């Protein structure tokens, strides 16, 4: 990412924390060099780390120290079997714990779709189990594979990212750069809006196409055993 920014004329400061933001400047500290700097800035935009809702933190043992919901492999709360969480609110440990400035794990759209699909299937299992009035605890089988698939544009350029899974260790890690990614991004946006308008947000042909190139959303225990 740093080399890509510099290639486009953007100066990047890594291992840096923000000390102060003024009307026309930003004061930072390079943690690795213990060097303080004052950078002129006509417009400053900060993207702070996500934190969970205060309401969640009030529930005993539901969240981590940042208020994110702790879940098991099936998107289910460790402490409350009737609570499932997907998306940005889920607690995911940092990928690299050795960084000087704490970093979080990326949560991309396809990963969140995978979490949602797994949660939906597992909730359905719980509902069916209750309707049958069975005394035993239901066995959840569906867990998200957390594969990463992303199309992004950088103005006149773009890239397609494919990581299987998104978080290391990975089996596949592919990045394709080029102007064609910009066209692909526009085409995908039109396709996505068409799905929403048509009310068919999870078409079978899309899942089949992705499956044929090795990208799936969820796996079950039966599939794990046969793999």
Residue spans for each PLM region:
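Flavin-binding catalytic cores
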Residues: 3, 7, 51, 114-126
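C-terminal, flexible cofactor-proximal segment of oxidoreductases
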Residues: 118-227
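FAD-site-proximal beta/loop scaffold in flavoenzymes
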Residues: 39-114
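Short regulatory "switch" loops immediately downstream of catalytic or recognition motifs
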Residues: 28-29, 89-97, 125-131
């Amino acid at each position: 990412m740093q080399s890509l920014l510099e290639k486009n004329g953007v100066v990047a400061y890594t291992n840096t924390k923000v000390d102060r933001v003024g009307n026309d400047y930003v004061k930072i500290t390079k943690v690795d060099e213990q060097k303080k700097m004052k950078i002129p800035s006509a417009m400053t935009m900060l993207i702070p780390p996500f934190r969970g809702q205060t309401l969640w933190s009030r529930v005993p043992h539901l969240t981590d120290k940042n208020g994110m919901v702790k879940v098991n492999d099936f998107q289910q709360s460790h402490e409350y079997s009737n609570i499932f969480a997907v998306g940005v609110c889920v607690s995911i440990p940092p990928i690299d714990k050795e960084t000087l400035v704490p970093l979080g794990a990326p949560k991309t759209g396809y990963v969140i779709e995978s979490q949602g699909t797994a949660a939906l299937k597992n909730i359905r299992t719980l509902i069916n189990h209750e309707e049958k009035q069975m005394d035993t605890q239901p066995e959840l089988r569906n867990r998200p594979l957390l594969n990463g698939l992303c199309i992004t544009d950088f103005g006149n350029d773009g890239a397609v990212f494919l990581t299987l899974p998104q978080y290391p260790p990975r089996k596949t890690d592919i990045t394709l750069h080029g102007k064609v990614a910009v066209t692909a991004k526009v085409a995908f946006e039109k396709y996505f809006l068409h799905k929403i308008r048509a009310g068919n947000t999870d078409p079978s042909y899309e899942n089949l196409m992705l499956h044929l190139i090795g990208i799936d959303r969820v796996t079950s225990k039966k599939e794990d055993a046969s793999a």
